[in-house]
Amino acid sequence: MGMRMVFTVFLLVVLATTVVSFTSDRASDGRNAAANDKASDLAALAVRGCCHDIFCKHNNPDICG
């Protein structure tokens, strides 16, 4: 393989790595945002004393157990 061919393969590998990294990062951002929203909702319910209210406790078993 010539030097030009090696350089071309190197550039293709860098480009492919960048594309894969970019798309997986965007997917990860969506999951992180959803997790953060759920965590803030759970924290808000806990702060308001949801687990002491029978109806709230019944509607949110994931927090109150």
UniProtKB/Swiss-Prot annotation:
Domain notes: The cysteine framework is I (CC-C-C). Alpha4/7 pattern.
Protein name per UniProt: Conotoxin Bu19
Family under the similarity heading: Belongs to the conotoxin A superfamily.
Pfam family, one: Toxin_8
Modified residues (Cysteine amide): C64
Signal peptide stretch: 1-21
Keyword check for Secreted: yes
A single GO molecular function term of this UniProt record: toxin activity
Superkingdom of origin: Eukaryota
GO cellular component, one term: extracellular region
Propeptide boundaries: 22-48
Subcellular localization, as worded in the UniProt entry: Secreted
SS bond partners: C50-C56, C51-C64
Keywords assigned: Amidation, Disulfide bond, Ion channel impairing toxin, Neurotoxin, Secreted, Signal, Toxin
Annotated source species: Conus bullatus
Expression across tissues: Expressed by the venom duct.
